[in-house]
Amino acid sequence: MHLSTSAAAILALSLAGPTMAGRPYFCPLALDAKFLQVPYCCEGFVPARDSKVSFEGVNCIDVSSDEDFVKTCPKGGTPKCCYSIGPKVICTTEVGDGVDK
């Protein structure tokens, strides 16, 4: 069975929707690959290989599970919406406002 890109995106959102309820942040699907993203704080960014819309994060930490989520990273800057592939963290968008708990 082969799903179209839009059907796959709708399926991903329907499966992830209940888990996103009540989060103080919002991360859309990745702009380059339509993966689910979560907030990461990174010390820096370099252009991702073969992409015009994404960046590879440098020394990143996942802050999605922080009890008191804040929009400021420990070393300054703001969290970015990213996904991980192996040891790499790929970021494509800014973190948006979610639903407060």
Swiss-Prot record:
Induction: Expressed after 12 to 24 hours post induction of asexual development, which correlates with the development of metulae and phialides. Expressed in vegetative hyphae. Its main location: secreted. It is found in: Secreted; Spore wall. Keywords: Conidiation, Disulfide bond, Secreted, Signal, Sporulation. The keyword Secreted applies. Residues 1-21 form the signal peptide. Disulfide bonds join C27-C81, C41-C73, C42-C60, C82-C91. Self-assembles to form functional amyloid fibrils called rodlets. Self-assembly into fibrillar rodlets occurs spontaneously at hydrophobic:hydrophilic interfaces and the rodlets further associate laterally to form amphipathic monolayers. Aerial growth, conidiation, and dispersal of filamentous fungi in the environment rely upon a capability of their secreting small amphipathic proteins called hydrophobins (HPBs) with low sequence identity. Class I can self-assemble into an outermost layer of rodlet bundles on aerial cell surfaces, conferring cellular hydrophobicity that supports fungal growth, development and dispersal; whereas Class II form highly ordered films at water-air interfaces through intermolecular interactions but contribute nothing to the rodlet structure. This is Unclassified hydrophobin dewD.
